[in-house]
Amino acid sequence: MADATASFDESGLRAVTATPRAAGDSLATAGVWEANAESLAAYATFCRTALFAPAQSPQWVRHWTEQVRPDTVVATLAVGGRPVLALALEIERHGPFRVARFMGGRHANGNFAAADPVWLETAAGPATRPLFDAIAAARPDIDVVALQRLLPDLDGRANPLAALPSHNSPNLSLAVDLEGGFEAVLSRTSGKRKRKKHRSQTRKFESAGGFRRLDAGTPEEVHSLLYAFFAMKEFRFRRMGIANVFGDPQVRIFFHKLFAEALKEDGAPFRLHGLEVGGKLRAVTGSSVSDRRLVCEFGAISEDDLAHASPGDFLFFENIRETCERGFSVYDFSVGDEPYKRQWCDIEIRHLDALVPLTLKGRMLASCLRGNAGIKSFIKNSPAIWSLTKTLRRKTAGKRLPAEED
């Protein structure tokens, strides 16, 4: 077997490679490594000139590997001896199956694997096949590679993984076109009503002891906002009757590390904002930067005496205004179709789920996952059924449902 990915890492790591295949006029080969210090350093080096989504950034991948410590691999595709695509994956056991997925699980949304921008101009779905052959050869225990919530494109370049056999993700993603600045955004989204509500909220918050919007600029501020956010989410998930996807202590440490370490980098690729009223945090958002797109990765409000004043809406108003002032072109609310997002959004993004079975068991699992996604899509696209589902879920709040049911 030829080591076609030596240029990916010059430290001499051994890679398991797939049988070379023709890709245009060049030879495409692939390699797979355990995600260790050397391969993660090589991944970071490749990302310096690559295009990728926030959840595939070197920072996200490194902190997830170090803090959550899953079973992980880094797979690379090279064309003509030059790396063009890198997949950082974690492997999880689901019953009798092993599934490889993007690091971060359900926290990884709007996914776009690290890829060479020049290669993306001509890349096609079949060109990625050697990558999955290599994964199957290196890790025959993996049944399915589940690449979920894929962005169809990023910065005008098509996602090569979206060309794989895929289906629509059950959850829609919503975003705001910021063209023309904040005034233009308001003019397109009931701006008069929004301004009136914002003024009313301002008066309520001032009478409740004053308010301030926080932009976490120190590790201490990061930790303070995250502690508050996790408490808000814990309360809400318990009330809704679903498992808390932020409940794992290692996942919480991951986010603390991710946002605190991001402060050391130019432009802070991950940022926290909060709204404090009367000396108490009432709303928190966590965002990532993807070129000229700001992505709200998560948010929560304190369900207390001021919840009726919609502190979350107030914070989004200020966040979107600042995002416009900073010259971004899109404010992305990420996954989930909710009324508070619809008040702003004029862009719908349909993510894709690509399932690549590597074993006979994997084919069976992929078929079940596709069927499950179809059922979820039907439920969530049927307002009456979805409303009934959420009502039943709240009534069974003492019996935790899987987080995937959200």
What do these predicted ranges mean?
Residues 72, 92-169, 290-349:
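Acyl-donor binding region in acyl/amide transferases
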Residues 104, 128-130, 188-195, 369-374:
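Short intrinsically disordered coil segments
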Residues 2-4, 114-158, 162, 216-217, ...:
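Intrinsically disordered, low-complexity, positively biased terminal segments
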Residues 36, 54, 121-124, 191-194, ...:
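Intrinsic-disorder-associated interaction segments
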Residues 86-90, 124-145, 192-210, 229, ...:
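A broadly tuned preference for mixed-charge, low-complexity surface segments
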Residues 110-115, 120-125, 180-186, 209-213, ...:
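Low-complexity, flexible helical/coil segments
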Residues 25-102, 149-173, 181, 186-308, ...:
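A conserved beta-strand-loop-helix scaffold within acyl/acetyltransferase catalytic domains
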Residues 2-27, 152-184, 189, 293, ...:
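Active-site/acyl-donor-binding loops of N-acyltransferases
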